[in-house]
Regions:
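Non-catalytic, structured segments within soluble enzyme domains
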Residues: 73-226
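Acidic/histidine-rich, surface-exposed loop or edge segments in extracytoplasmic proteins
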Residues: 10-20, 35-37, 56, 76, ...
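Preference for short coil/turn "hinge" residues that link or interrupt alpha-helices
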Residues: 5, 14, 19, 41, ...
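Surface-exposed beta-strand edges and their flanking turn/coil or helix-capping segments
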Residues: 14-16, 24-27, 68, 169-171, ...
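Short, solvent-exposed loop/turn elements at domain surfaces
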Residues: 8-11, 42-44, 165
Length: 226
């Protein structure tokens, strides 16, 4: 809370911490990591990938085959902000129609920037729920989104799949146990491999970054007293 002159009255604990930023304030490392992992055809499709949609729809609604890997970043954005994730044909159809419409109304950079500004990224070092890449960068590594290194970007890009599980921090802001930290670290290595697989990283860089110790970059816990 602030006075009219913008001086601080007090800090208020919020249920969700989010700091929207412009696309040019987000590191290309994050953008490449997200595209490589979540939607490698992002630049070429028009909102949906028909074969992937059919496979995922049959998996999630009818229980046939796999339910993963069918949603583009555009669909994920619609799912997060508009239609939810109920496993019904009606919901999936609405998601597809809205994704196609969104691609006609926004360019790729706008869609990617919006996705990165609203997606959930788990918890920060105070145990607060965070959304958006800027809050994630500040709350996990203590840097701005534009300054994230490749390993840091890979870690953050992997979080939206399962934000609380992969977050390095517990609900009280403390660092998780070594065993539980490994879940997010393994996910980050998967992201790095996807970056290599799709050509975003050379083999040499992939091997170097895969050996990097991300735990030394996590900022110290600063839990909020309840």
């Amino acid at each position: 809370l602030t006075y009219s002159d913008k001086s601080l009255i007090a800090e208020v604990d919020s249920d969700l911490i989010r700091t929207p930023v412009a696309g040019d304030a987000i590191s290309d490392n994050v953008k490449k990591a997200v595209i490589a992992t979540e939607d490698e055809n992002f630049e070429s499709h028009k909102g949906v990938v028909p074969k992937a949609v059919l496979r995922a729809t049959l998996g999630s609604v009818a229980g046939v085959g796999s339910s993963s890997g069918g949603s583009t970043l555009t669909q994920q954005l619609i799912k997060q902000q508009v239609v939810g994730d109920a496993p019904t044909f009606t919901r999936k159809a609405t998601e597809i129609v809205d994704a196609l419409a969104l691609e006609r109304g926004m360019d790729k950079n706008e869609i990617l920037t919006t996705y990165l500004n609203v997606s959930p990224f788990g918890r920060n070092n105070r145990g607060q729920n965070i959304a958006g890449v800027e809050a994630a960068a500040q709350g996990i590594f203590g840097v701005s989104a534009k300054d994230l290194t490749v390993p840091q970007a890979a870690f953050i890009a992997g979080l939206p799949q399962s934000p609380i599980v992969y977050s390095p921090y517990a609900a009280d802001g403390s660092l998780k146990s070594k065993e539980n930290l490994e879940l997010g670290l393994a996910r980050a290595k998967d992201v790095l491999f996807n970056m290599y697989r799709t050509g975003a990283l050379s083999k040499k860089d992939y091997e170097t970054y895969a050996q990097y110790d991300l735990t030394k970059d996590f900022i110290a816990p600063d839990g909020i007293e309840k």
